């Protein structure tokens, strides 16, 4: 006799919705839809609009505003799409160019990354622009803001060395405009000078009270430069309504905000090209061609003493570099002699006796007894470099061969070895762990 299993009980529509098969099918379909919506190419967001409306701070500038630059960098989903606005005839003549474009291009090819911190971090490369076509008699306000490129969050895939979409963007942070501290400029100043935004700082602190630009980590951003024609009746720089303005965007300045560098090539390029990363630079890993290229970029991108530098400052830059090379530490003479070299060569002064512990410096007795002759100027010990100017009697006595005499006033605050007296200082230098720093 055959066994026939009992018929399976039919589930109601409500119970069927919670079955394993129903849950699995609905979950897979939702995941598929989420994945498709997440990995949409950025070009779809670019095609949705032909222009971008400034953020809330620039909402009053609609009647006279205009955006210049690549449409792909301008048009993003988080920004409000509007119709392109024709600028006034006077503002249409103004053009803006990005300085050190070659350096920006190098970073853009790799995917520029900018560090953001709680306290704020400066940008490198720096946004530096120059204007032409402005009215010499008019006054202009130059400002900068940074807007999101899209509404996506990214992650860096190390195995592919590329950025991938990780999901939707975090909630937008409060938008901020950075008004250049030297604004307003006259048109004549803008034609002669370069405007640098080197003091702009990026932060991820939503409660920042220092005026830094607030960004989200792992999001892509586009810096924008705005120039506004200031009218005489404008009471404040922040009263931008009814003002004529124009916006310039450079696609090569797009960057990803990060809390730590993701791409090692970006780290290397920043170390090699940033003049303030000198301590991390190892010139031996660069070829002659690379070193020459990097040095030329650094020279063009060297920081000026003020946020604005004239075009004729290249000659001054060369003078500054020569002056920097001529400056030495407290341990070198004008002839670039080290302290140990000066000690070994100072026996040319009659009456000078070496302590017995000098042999521990690695200088043989024979070399101490027969020093290499030096000219009189080079033989003078670097007391003036140590804060002890030579008196006329000291110089005269040293030239007459009777041994220099030095003033007996208190030595200024320099290295602690010299505060202990000459003999104790030489003994302190015997230890290899001694740190040679110019100041304490």
From Swiss-Prot:
Keywords: Developmental protein, DNA-binding, Nucleus, Transcription, Transcription regulation
UniProt-listed InterPro entries: p53-like_TF_DNA-bd_sf, T-box_DNA-bd, T-box_sf, TF_T-box, TF_T-box_CS
Residue stretches of biased makeup (Polar residues): 321-333
Lineage per the UniProt record: Eukaryota, Metazoa, Chordata, Craniata, Vertebrata
Nucleus recorded as keyword: yes
Molecular function in Gene Ontology: DNA-binding transcription activator activity, RNA polymerase II-specific; DNA-binding transcription factor activity, RNA polymerase II-specific; RNA polymerase II cis-regulatory region sequence-specific DNA binding; RNA polymerase II-specific DNA-binding transcription factor binding
Organism, scientific name: Gallus gallus (Chicken)
Function of the molecule: Acts as a transcriptional regulator involved in heart developmental processes.
Database matches in Pfam families: T-box (PF00907)
Record carries keyword Transcription regulation: yes
GO biological process: aortic valve morphogenesis; atrial septum morphogenesis; atrioventricular canal development; blood circulation; branching involved in blood vessel morphogenesis; cardiac chamber formation; cardiac muscle tissue morphogenesis; cardiac right ventricle morphogenesis
Gene, per the UniProt record: TBX20
Residue range(s) of DNA binding per entry: 103-282
Protein name, entry field: T-box transcription factor TBX20
Stretches the record annotates as Disordered: 308-333
